[in-house]
Amino acid sequence: MSVSVPRLVAWETTRRCNLRCGHCRANAGNCGCDGELSFAEAKALVDGIASFAKPILILTGGEPLLCEWIFDIAGYAKAKGLRPVLGTNATLIDAATAKKIAEAGIGRISVSLDFPDAKRHDAFRGVDGAFEAAKRGIANATEAGIEVQINTTVTKKNRDLVGEMHDLAARLGAKAFHPFLLVPAGRGKSLEDAGLSAQEYENTLGFICRLASESKLEIKPTDAPQYQRIIRQQCGDAVCTGKGCLAGTGFAFVGHTGDVQPCGYFEFRAGNIREKPFPEIWRDAKVFADLRNPDLLKGKCGLCEYRSVCGGCRARALAASGDYLAEEPFCAHVPDRVLLKELQENFPVVDRPYAEIGKRLGIDERQCHERTMSLTRRGMIRRIGASLNPGKIGYSSTLVAFKVPPERLDEVAQKVSAYEEVTHNYSRDNEWNLWFTIVAENRGAVKRVVETLKRECGVSDALELPAEKTYKLKAVFS
């Protein structure tokens, strides 16, 4: 199987940082860390990436501007055909630094702002004055011709402020607004209580989808693969070209000591560039191979009709269960196959069955009924009702098999399914390729339906297998 090349590679240039953010994945701080890559090793990393791909190279940290050769490595990456961008808190960007960023070939910086005011932002970032310093840095970058992307980490504390943060980004002259949905990694583990519930994720991403349809900014939620499902549900497949989780398929993360991970929040070591070149790790690591195969996904992610465009957040699955292929723990969507299974196996005989089923699946009665009707319109459900034993109520039944030319199978199947006397209709992979059951008030009526269908469908080869003894088997279609 051919392996795609990475579209983005994030490299943690250092773990030093002048802020103390409560959610920091890297648990970064003022002190340096032993074992960080040297400039020579950084050049070797760039050479390895450039040997087989030309991705966006995200220079991140910590605070990458505290890496003494950050501009040299950015320029080197640019010369190799990569597109360097900078993930910075912007507090260190004065006019001179902004000029150096631009001269190094860095065309965009991403800056994290989490609240629309200094008091709350500074508290979240752990340093007084961080908000105003970041705004000054953004202004200096914009003046130097550098594009600015504003990132906002969304938690319970600011989920109702996403619209305000978007408006702030626009006022600051940003080109893009990327809401980040909290992943419990690094110091972020201590903020798990501030993380959104599955339904809050759903509601927040729905709001962002509507915001994106009206905004002049580029809006892209990050660490939110469910967004690709939501925009398809709200806008349709025609306007959707993106994919959810890119970990291991289009994205990789290189840590400050050379460890390679599927993403920065995905705390699983795929290899180390000091031991093996980056291209080999990308091509051969088992975790990457697993992530490239959606058939390996488990739980409701494995059953989901959106698994190829969403995939669930593998970092959240790993953090919650220890298994990166487990189901996404913060997804409220009920896959079609899960609903179908519940309808077939556990349909309740009560006054309001859809309320009962919805309660079991975590959706409301209206949504459960509408989803069921949608499955019916799409042909996945033929009927919902009691299955009676024809012989017990004086009726007759027979199993019929038609021999249909393969090119006419769909046409004939539709004609057969249109008859209310037909209770089952399915294909089999042999010469008798269309099978169905007919139930009518007596044997003569059954015979008339069979003859009418043969005539209307232009079929001469038919088997009639009338029921002699009934055996009830539990058949569930997935």
Name what the model sees in each region.
Residues D336-S478:
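A compositional/biophysical signature of low hydrophobicity enriched in polar/charged and small residues
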Residues Q199-Q233, D259-G312:
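C-terminal accessory region of radical SAM enzymes
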Residues M1-S4, G255-C263, F268-I273, L297-K341:
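Radical SAM enzyme core and accessory elements
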Residues N30-G32, D117-F124, G186-L191, L434:
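A short acidic, helix-capping loop that chelates divalent metal ions and anchors anionic groups
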Residues A176-L196, K220-Q234, R269, E468-V476:
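Flexible glycine/acidic-rich beta-alpha junction loops that bind and position SAM and/or redox cofactors
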Residues V3-F39:
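Canonical Radical SAM [4Fe-4S] cluster-binding loop centered on the CxxxCxxC motif
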Residues F39-T60, L66-P184, L196-S197:
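Radical SAM/AdoMet-radical enzyme domain recognition
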Residues C245-T249:
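Short, small/polar residue-rich loop motifs at catalytic or cofactor-binding pockets
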